[in-house]
Structure formats: C-alpha cells, structure tokens
Amino acid sequence: MNARSRALLLLLLVAASAAVLPFLRYLTDDTFIHLQFAKHLVQGKGFSFNAGEPTYGATSPLWVLLLAMTGKLLPISVAAPSDPASMPALAWAAKGYGLLFHLVAILALVLLGKRLGWDDRTALGLGVLLAAQAWTLRWALSGMETPLAVACVALALYGFAGVLVRDRPGWGTGIALGLASLARPECTLLAAIVVVTVWMGAERRPRRALEVLAGLGAALLPWLATAWTWFHTLLPNTAAAKAGATLEPGPFVAALHAVFQVELAADALPLALFVLVLAFGNRSNALPVARGRRFFWFACVAWPALLALSFALEGVQVVSRYLLPATPCVLLLGMASFRWVVATNLPNRYGAALALFLAAFVVQNALFTALVSAPSTIAHTSGLRSSLVSIGIWARDRTAPNASFAVADIGAFGYYSERHVLDLYGLVTPVLAPITVREGYNAVVTRALYEVAGRPDYLIDRHPREGRLAQDQDQPSPYRFLFARRIPNLGITRPGGFYYSVYAIDWRVMDQTRQRVASALPGGPQRRIL
C-alpha cells in the first residue's frame, strides 16, 4: 500500500470506531453469562456459573479466559455494582476488547484483499463493507465474544489465502482456526473445510495440510484436555441448550427462514451480486485458473452455506450473531462478484461502480441500524436493567444466601443476585436441556419438570402475561406471585413485550396437588406425574 492508501486505512479504522458508538451501552443477558464465569474464575470459584460447580456452560471459553485474565491483572472490580444503571467494570473491559477485535477484523480483511491481488481501493472497499455491516456494528460493543470470533476467522482466511495462493506455511492458519473454534464452537466446521481444501488445493498438499492441523491442535488441545479434566466432556452444554428438534421439518424451515432474514437485512447487495455470477457466469470466465485460488473460493462458498445448513438440521433458534463468523466470506464473495460483474459489463467504469456499490451498501446498513437495530438495543438494554438486573439485586438483598431460583434467562440475574440458579433451558443445568427441547418451556414451568434438577425456592417465569401461573387456578397454586418486571423486547426477532414474574414456590402445595391429580387417574394414587 502507498502512503495515501495507508492514510485512508487509518481513516477507515477511525470511522469504524465512531460507527459503533450508538451501541456503547448495549448489553444482553448472555453478556452476563460470560461475566459470571469470568468473575468466578477470578474469585477462585472455578469455571462455573454457580460458584464452585464447574460446568461447560460458556459457549466461548476463550472469551471467558480473556475476561478472567483481565479481571485478575487489572485493578478493576469483577463483582456486580449495586446500582442497576451502572455498567460493570468487567463489561467495559469486554466492550474494549470488542472494539479492538472489530478493528483487527477490518484490518485483516483489507490485507486479505491485497493478498488476493486486488488493488488498494478494492481492498479498502472490502474493509468498508465489514465496518458498515449492520450486524457487525450491533455486536461489536455488546460484550459478547462475536468480534473475537470474526477477527479470528478473518485472520484464518488471510493465512488460508497465503497457503493456497502463495504457498505459505499453514501453522498460523491452524492457530487462528483453533482460536476461532474456542471463540465460537461452530468454527470447527470452518477448520474442517480449510483442512480439506488445503489437502486438495495447495501446491504441497500433505505438508501444508499437516501444518494447518498442527497449528489447530496447538490451539485446541490444551483447552480440550482442560475441559475433559474439569467437566468430563469436550462439547459445551450450549450444543443441546440452543438446539431444537433435530431433523424435524418445522425447526428446519424456521432456522432457514431466520438465516435468510438476517442475511438479507445486511448483506442483500453482496448476495445479489453473487447470485448474478451463479446465474450468468461459467467455469471459463468466473473461476480463476489457478487451482489454489479455485479452492479458496470454494471454501468461501462452503463455509456460510454449511453453517446455515447445520443450524437448520439441528433446529437452532438462529440469531444474527451466530452467523457473523461467516460474514467475512459473504463479503469476500460479494466483492469478488462485484469485480466480475463490472469487468464483464463496465470495464472502464470500475472506480465509479465501486463507489456506487459501497455507498449503496453503507446506506442500506446505516438505515437498518438507525431505524431498527439501534433503537431495539436501547430499548432492550433499558428493559434488561429494569427487569432481570433489578430482580437480581432484589434477590441479593432480600432473600436468604442459600436460596435457589429456577430461571429462564440466567445471565444478568445470576451475575447480580449471587444466588444459586437452576437454568430452565439447561445451559448450566444440562439435565434440563433435553427435557426443555422435548417438552417445551411452558410444560417445564407449568408441570414443574425442572424438579429433576432440584427443588428451587423461587421461580422467575418469562411470559407475555404477568403473573400467569397464579391466575385462573381451580385449585390452590404452588406458585405465590410476588411481583413482575417488564422488558420491551428480547431482540429484533422477538419484539413483543415480556414479563419476568417472580414466584415463591410452595412445594407442600405442589405435592398435594399432584396427589389429588394422581388419585383421579385410572389406577389410583400410585400413579405420580410431574
């Protein structure tokens, strides 16, 4: 890059930093799950959500370890503040890391464009796409692991291009893929794709593939050995807690529908250009001649497609951040498709066409951010503070230290309450994950199916209707309604208002109710139901 391009790159990074400011105070309930695990590591209570109970309930061990190391080394408090309006110090650290990794990802994509042989303006344009992408902006300062995963993927793609295009060693690529997998477990799929394509497309195939595998192992194996020692499992509990019904048509279609909604909201233009190439291109004029380059682009197509398909097959309830690790490939394909379309139709108007393409992309994503994404996050964060955060502070101040709570959304409540949590979705209470997937959340609550994991003192129910479990009862209810707090949305895909209703559970009434129901069933009182 010449001096002018380097100055433009610096300007791009400054603009990218400014673009995320609308999300400066954005927090999600899942953010507090990471903070809770990191807090307990710093306090010597293990890799645990409930203090002293190790569990693989964190999707991103790398993010938790990074936050814990920060809490250990810096003079900051890892405990929750007493004021629900105050930002936890550890959350500020997470936001700082998020911005850093967001900028690293942009820089890596610009360098990747240069490595592919693109001119400075095209490589910088690729960075503009990532800096302006609405979902990237939304999650950059959320305190979640998403920017870390995107940065690791971008660095892995940079190394991957070096292996296939320039016959560079694969160690760094493997390490970046391993770190990406520790940031988001779905990135193990990308690692598999890269290993296969390096084996098939690199100039020195066995050697380069083994180098990638060695780098991957160097990053992954220490954590896998630790996970087996601590949890006796290699897979996070989220694999079951966030999945629906595997291979069933309903969840499959719902997941694909969510994927299309997420992608079209931000990446409609790059995807439209890619569709044009698929429709009108052919092997001779759309694919590069060099074998390594062909396999690089095959991998860029395979990663987003297989990621979306895996979510659909598992019935995952897809949200935008799950797809962001594939965004660098989507944008790469969009820019490559743009270059082909312009070279085919407007070869002498490349500069003007590039400016128009980038402007259209920026405007689309800026409008979506201003009209939909940013207002949603502001409302959500305010509602989170006034609901789960406030309930957590109430529990910390007004309930016994040994009290336990059954909760659907565990993060903010667990972090602030310092009370034992029984997770109704099974993230940190894995025995409940298959039950909730099979029976549904409503059945778990109304039939007290969570009892298999223990008898909590309180229940925090999430439902559009306030205090619903204590209403319309023909018989005494085991749930004594205490109070409720409202949250205006649970994200863009769940915009309706919800109530978090707090109940005290009377297990004596619960048992008596079951006995009466059992006595009325064929076979008499010996038949006990949950």
State the predicted function of each range.
Residues 59, 63, 67-74, 85-88, ...:
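Transmembrane alpha-helices of multi-pass, membrane-embedded glycan-processing enzymes
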